[in-house]
Regions:
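Chalcogenol-based redox active-site neighborhoods
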Residues: 28, 53-54
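The canonical Cys-X-X-Cys-His
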Residues: 16-19, 62
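Typically the conserved alpha-helix immediately C-terminal to a functionally engaged Cys/Sec
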Residues: 18-33
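Non-catalytic, surface beta->alpha helical segment in thiol-disulfide oxidoreductase systems
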Residues: 58, 63-90
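Short active-site neighborhood of thiol/selenol oxidoreductases, capturing the structured segment around
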Residues: 2-14
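Hydrophobic beta-strand anchors of alpha/beta hydrolase catalytic cores
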Residues: 8-9, 39, 62
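Structural microenvironment flanking redox-active thiols in thiol-disulfide oxidoreductases
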Residues: 44-52
Length: 90
């Protein structure tokens, strides 16, 4: 289904400390932005097809989707203000 808002997907793996830290930042960002963005997480051990197609090589990775299509990976991992600025919505 095609979302009408930007969608961020964090690719993560259990036991990855940086992944857990990013999840906390993303939860705060979701709270601040509400319905202006949809933030999802994907465990690469359970769902490996999409990360493989995107050639995810390190974790955590944060992918931006618009209109249902992959747009790009975004930086600022762990810094919600940097992530927000790359979304151009807040």
């Amino acid at each position: 289904e095609c979302a009408t808002v930007p969608v961020l997907v964090e690719f993560w793996r259990p036991g990855c400390g940086h992944c857990q830290a990013l999840m906390k930042e993303l939860a705060q960002l979701q709270g601040e932005l509400g319905e202006r963005v949809l933030i999802l997480t994907m465990n690469v051990d359970e769902n490996f097809q999409i990360p493989a197609e995107l050639e995810v090589s390190s974790l955590p990775a944060l992918a931006l989707y618009r209109g249902g299509s992959f747009e790009r990976f975004i930086g600022g991992l762990g810094k919600k203000d940097e992530i927000r600025s790359q979304l151009l919505i807040g």
